Amino acid sequence: MNIPLRIGGCASGPGCGDGEGSVQVATDPLLAIETAKVFAVYGKGGIGKSTTSSNLSAAFSKLGKRVLQIGCDPKHDSTFTLTKRFVPTVIDVLESVNFHAEELRAEDFIFEGYNGVMCVEAGGPPAGAGCGGYVVGQTVKLLKAHHLLEDTDVVIFDVLGDVVCGGFAAPLQFADRTLIVCANDFDSIFAMNRIVAAIASKAKNYKVRLGGVIANRSAELDQIDNYNNRVGLKTMAHFRDLDAIRRSRLKKSVIFEMDPSPEILAVQAEYMHLAETLWAGTEPLDAMPLKDREIFDLLGYD
């Protein structure tokens, strides 16, 4: 089963109509994830997507759900707090068998973490070469081949930075909802606007829709609220800039493993509420991105 690279326009089918002259990774329709709720987590680089994704995975697991988290970043640190270590990536293990995928066992690339959360790190191609979308496609292909998606309730893709090229937008082809992690500042909101544009493009041909915003490392929400009200987004959860959250990552722990304190318990409750809301189902948001100049004007820049 090949994962072809589709360049430029095409007549019809998945991967088409995503923008004239664009380079898109067209995923085989047989790789669709149909048995689980699938979320793709995006946001500005360094905004805390991996911490957010891992804590959300843990929250889903505490609801009794069978969870799979897929890290889509060459740094392969998405599942670090769930597994307490850096696990081998799919690309690493494929390279070890000269890319003969049939020689791999499930335990070579999938690892159990906190409270039974299953963890995979897709990894990425060498710097300056290859395509991240191909890596994501091959990861899902392996999971399907080993029947690892059949008993899964929730899949979370934790995606590299705010890159929304045809490659790292590939998880959008599998997702039901996209969650955007954002801080209450211009750079984060500017990145969020680009992600909103990518979702609007992908939604023409795939089932993915915007789920909402996860405000992170932010005392206030005024800038996020201004943007949300303008484009049609909603904030689903709000996590302040707390030292306790930073310490949890330094301790290789999800937030539910930290010693209880009022602020820790409040963060845990917010993650549980977010997981419950997402599991119950959310209405898709039909947000429309702003032009760059409009964002400057909206947020008070001359």
Swiss-Prot record:
Gene3D superfamilies associated with the record: P-loop containing nucleotide triphosphate hydrolases
Keyword Magnesium: yes
PROSITE patterns per record: NIFH_FRXC_1, NIFH_FRXC_2, NIFH_FRXC_3
Recorded catalytic activity of this chain's protein: chlorophyllide a + oxidized 2[4Fe-4S]-[ferredoxin] + 2 ADP + 2 phosphate = protochlorophyllide a + reduced 2[4Fe-4S]-[ferredoxin] + 2 ATP + 2 H2O
Key words of the record: 4Fe-4S, ATP-binding, Bacteriochlorophyll biosynthesis, Chlorophyll biosynthesis, Iron, Iron-sulfur, Magnesium, Metal-binding, Nucleotide-binding, Oxidoreductase, Photosynthesis
Any one GO biological process: photosynthesis, dark reaction
Pathway: Porphyrin-containing compound metabolism; bacteriochlorophyll biosynthesis (light-independent)
Enzyme Commission identifier(s): 1.3.7.7
Recorded superkingdom: Bacteria
Residues that coordinate or bind ATP: G46, I47, G48, K49, S50, T51, K75, N216, R217
Binding-site residues, Mg(2+): S50
MF terms (GO), sorted A to Z: 4 iron, 4 sulfur cluster binding; ATP binding; metal ion binding; oxidoreductase activity, acting on iron-sulfur proteins as donors; oxidoreductase activity, acting on the CH-CH group of donors, iron-sulfur protein as acceptor
Top-level enzyme category: oxidoreductase
Cofactor or coenzyme needed: [4Fe-4S] cluster
Binding-site positions, [4Fe-4S] cluster: C131, C165
UniProt function note: Component of the dark-operative protochlorophyllide reductase (DPOR) that uses Mg-ATP and reduced ferredoxin to reduce ring D of protochlorophyllide (Pchlide) to form chlorophyllide a (Chlide). This reaction is light-independent. The L component serves as a unique electron donor to the NB-component of the complex, and binds Mg-ATP.
Family from the record: Belongs to the NifH/BchL/ChlL family.
Oligomeric form and interacting partners: Homodimer. Protochlorophyllide reductase is composed of three subunits; BchL, BchN and BchB.
Protein name in UniProt: Light-independent protochlorophyllide reductase iron-sulfur ATP-binding protein
